[in-house]
């Protein structure tokens, strides 16, 4: 079995496209195929919004790696290898940003699973130039194209979706970039969690902050707390910072791969964990979040989370804390509470 994800396997069948190129890899890349590319290319750079992947790839001395919501460094790339992202809006955002940066005569290779909507590249790339499918395998497609038209200048500010959410008497302006959980809406799980929260004090972590709805509401309702917000996704980090600024709030927003960059003395950990699909990988991440939480709480620190009720989180929480209460419940969501003894 290949160590590569299916889109990398189809790219691996077409290595001649990359010979002698300066390649920038972006999008939903999550394996070490860029390392193999270094044997065929003049240079390889990786731009990723996934902090976990960045932590893996940054240790390679053969590749320049960049983490962020915007690629704004000097580059000699003359080819973009785009792994098609899950959200179409994120694909549009990446194309607009990277084509503006790389410019006319940049070649593009797009790989992605057919079910992810990679076919959309055919229409989406029209404003830049021609693109055509050259290979299909493993339920994936391989496209090659060329940017012949001058791309429009890119301004990240224009890509934020701005919307207002109201809870009781409190209203909040939320700023959200494409690719962020619940982009443009206030999800029901977060609403239930906020309605259930007690008064907060001390240092509070909003884990998996998304566009910053939870953290901003908590900071607004409890002005004396020291709010910290973390996420694995660079678009979420930038969105949360923008949400805080839009509401005149302050807090520390940073990237973290679960607890890789967090403190260990939080009075509260509050989360709408981004693990709703029930996939094995998500359960592993959730088990780490819940199981290791006591190590990141101060004495008598408390954790309050919202989760889909079908997820078997209470035994994991009970195992970590020796206690677990259900504070609130609907037919879809449950609010779980645990205290470090």
Swiss-Prot record:
Superkingdom per UniProt: Bacteria
Alphabetical list of InterPro entries matching this protein: DNA_methylase_N6_adenine_CS, Mtase_sm_N, rRNA_ssu_MeTfrase_C, RsmC/RlmG, SAM-dependent_MTases_sf, Small_mtfrase_dom
EC class name: transferase
Pfam family, one: MTS
Molecular function terms from GO: 16S rRNA (guanine(1207)-N(2))-methyltransferase activity; nucleic acid binding
Keyword rRNA processing listed: yes
CDD domains: AdoMet_MTases
EC number annotated for this UniProt entry: 2.1.1.172
UniProt keyword terms in alphabetical order: Cytoplasm, Methyltransferase, rRNA processing, S-adenosyl-L-methionine, Transferase
GO cellular component term, pick one: cytoplasm
Catalytic reaction equation(s): guanosine(1207) in 16S rRNA + S-adenosyl-L-methionine = N(2)-methylguanosine(1207) in 16S rRNA + S-adenosyl-L-homocysteine + H(+)
Residues annotated as signal peptide: none
Cellular compartment(s): Cytoplasm
Main location: cytoplasm
Subunit structure: Monomer.
PANTHER family, A to Z: RIBOSOMAL RNA SMALL SUBUNIT METHYLTRANSFERASE C (PTHR47816:SF4)
Similarity-based family: Belongs to the methyltransferase superfamily. RsmC family.
Known role: Specifically methylates the guanine in position 1207 of 16S rRNA in the 30S particle.
Record's protein name: Ribosomal RNA small subunit methyltransferase C
Species whose genome carries this gene: Vibrio parahaemolyticus serotype O3:K6 (strain RIMD 2210633)
Organism taxonomic ancestry: Bacteria, Pseudomonadati, Pseudomonadota, Gammaproteobacteria, Vibrionales
Gene encoding the protein: rsmC
């Amino acid at each position: 079995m290949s160590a590569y994800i299916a889109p990398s396997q189809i790219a691996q069948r077409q290595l001649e496209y990359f010979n002698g190129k300066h390649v920038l890899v972006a999008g939903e890349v999550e394996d070490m195929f860029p390392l193999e590319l270094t044997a065929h290319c003049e240079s390889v750079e990786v731009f990723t919004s996934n902090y976990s992947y960045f932590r893996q790839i940054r240790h390679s001395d053969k590749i320049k790696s960049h983490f962020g919501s915007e690629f704004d460094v000097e580059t000699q790339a003359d080819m973009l290898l785009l792994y098609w992202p899950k959200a179409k809006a994120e694909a549009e955002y990446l194309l607009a940003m990277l084509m503006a940066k790389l410019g006319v005569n940049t070649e593009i290779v797009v790989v992605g699973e057919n079910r992810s909507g990679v076919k959309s590249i055919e229409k989406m790339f029209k404003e830049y130039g021609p693109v055509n499918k050259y290979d299909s395998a493993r339920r994936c497609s391989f496209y090659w194209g060329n940017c012949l038209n001058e791309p429009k200048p890119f301004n990240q500010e224009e890509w934020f979706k701005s919307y207002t959410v109201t809870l009781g008497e409190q209203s909040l302006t939320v700023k959200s970039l494409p690719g962020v959980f619940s982009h443009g809406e206030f999800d029901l799980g977060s609403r239930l969690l906020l309605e259930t929260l007690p008064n907060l004090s001390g240092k509070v972590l909003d884990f998996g902050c998304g566009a910053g709805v939870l953290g901003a509401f908590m900071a607004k309702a409890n002005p004396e707390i020291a709010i910290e917000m973390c996420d694995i996704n660079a678009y979420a980090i930038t969105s949360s910072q923008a949400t805080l600024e839009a509401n005149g709030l302050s807090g520390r927003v940073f990237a973290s791969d679960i607890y890789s960059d967090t403190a260990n003395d939080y009075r509260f950990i509050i989360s709408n964990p981004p693990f709703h699909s029930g996939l094995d990988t998500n359960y592993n991440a959730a088990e780490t979040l819940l199981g290791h939480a006591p190590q990141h709480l101060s004495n008598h620190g408390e954790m309050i989370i919202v989760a889909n009720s079908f997820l078997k989180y209470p035994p994991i929480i009970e195992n970590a804390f020796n206690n677990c209460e259900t504070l609130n419940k609907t037919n879809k969501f449950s609010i779980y509470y645990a205290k470090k003894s």
